[in-house]
Amino acid sequence: MYALIRQLLFRLEPEQAHRVSMQLARLGLRIAAVPGVRSLPAVPRRVMGIDFPNPVGLAAGFDKDGEYMDVLEQLGFGFLELGTVTPRAQPGNPQPRVFRIPEHEALINRMGFNNQGAEPLVRRLEVSRHRGVVGINIGKNRDTPPERAVEDYAQALGMVYGVADYVAVNLSSPNTPGLRDLQHEGALRNLIDRLQTERKRLAELHDKRVPLVVKIAPDWEAGELDATLDILLERRVDGIVATNTTLGRTGVEQTPQARESGGLSGAPLREQAEWVLEQVAARRDRRTALIAAGGIMSGEDVTRRLDLGADLVQLYTGMIYRGPGLVQEAVRAAARHAGQPA
């Protein structure tokens, strides 16, 4: 059924197709096309002190402003990561800014943190009936100068803290100029120290400790990843999301879309994301959660990431190419990996 729906959706511009697909799902059309959602096995995981009903989550970027939580929670996800949100609303980059490469099950996007701002998301969560696990991914506004980036992150953390089960710090989007520089050396130390100080204050204010995770890039020069991991592990962040989209074009070099700027996601990212995941898994202690993202297109991919050491996995581009049935496939793969009936 989804193959037919996808043919129709792919006739639309990607952002329009995304909105239409979510509206159709809200009407129940896509839910009806995915039998067995409510009979999915429970695959409980306790990670970062949070009880997840299963380890399969939605990656940031799919529901930036929390507008589709009612739809997404019915698909079988164990958690939703909303955002990226910034302290102030911003339009993102000019359109077109998303490009499909169907023959490679890939996307290139240069969205640029388009979002309504943190405050509207917080209001939606405050009145939402959604009771599942929610992470919120935060970033800096594009017009905030690099020397003030830390304050943007601290402000965003303060805004979302009361409604988040965990907060993901996005330092790795390739579509905000200078953002990835925050992954390195002194800038990273300063940022993590500032956020942990702010988290301590917020924990006392809200009487709860919200885990902080950092989302990292897949693109690293020799030695850079180890240096970044040194800082993240030394500063005892609660988790690491590996990875964001890549600036590389391996596997899609001959396509017309390869000339477009932005981050590449989907199947061509699989090998690179797995390599980074493996490096992080080899370094981290068991206290540091590991969330796998990037190029997860099948249940086999889920099994592979869990084998490599991931505690949780996240889907995005796979949902666009495989549809909501991928969530079921992923959860059942996680159940089999845990030795449970699927």
From Swiss-Prot:
Task: List the keywords (alphabetical).
Answer: Cell membrane, Flavoprotein, FMN, Membrane, Oxidoreductase, Pyrimidine biosynthesis
GO MF annotation terms: dihydroorotate dehydrogenase (quinone) activity
Query: What are the names of the required cofactors?
Result: FMN
Residues involved in FMN binding? 60-64, 84, 137, 170, 215, 243, 266, 295, 316-317
Enzyme Commission number(s): 1.3.5.2
Report which superkingdom the organism of origin falls in.
Bacteria
Task: List the membrane topology term(s).
Answer: Peripheral membrane protein
Under which main EC class is this enzyme filed? oxidoreductase
The main place the protein resides is membrane
* Subcellular location as annotated: Cell membrane
Q: Binding residues for substrate, per the UniProt record?
A: 64, 109-113, 170, 175, 244-245
**What reaction is this protein's catalytic activity?**
(S)-dihydroorotate + a quinone = orotate + a quinol
Assigned GO CC terms: cytoplasm; plasma membrane
Do you know which Pfam families this protein is assigned to?
Answer: DHO_dh (PF01180)
What are the positions of the active site? 173
| Pathway(s) where this gene product acts | Pyrimidine metabolism; UMP biosynthesis via de novo pathway; orotate from (S)-dihydroorotate (quinone route): step 1/1
Query: What does the record note about the cofactor?
Result: Binds 1 FMN per subunit.
Q: Name one GO biological process term.
A: 'de novo' UMP biosynthetic process
Respond yes or no to whether keyword Transport is given for this record: no
* Binding partners and assembly: Monomer.
Q: What does this protein do?
A: Catalyzes the conversion of dihydroorotate to orotate with quinone as electron acceptor.
The family annotation for this protein states:
Belongs to the dihydroorotate dehydrogenase family. Type 2 subfamily.
This protein is called Dihydroorotate dehydrogenase (quinone)
Taxonomic classification, please? Bacteria, Pseudomonadati, Pseudomonadota, Gammaproteobacteria, Chromatiales
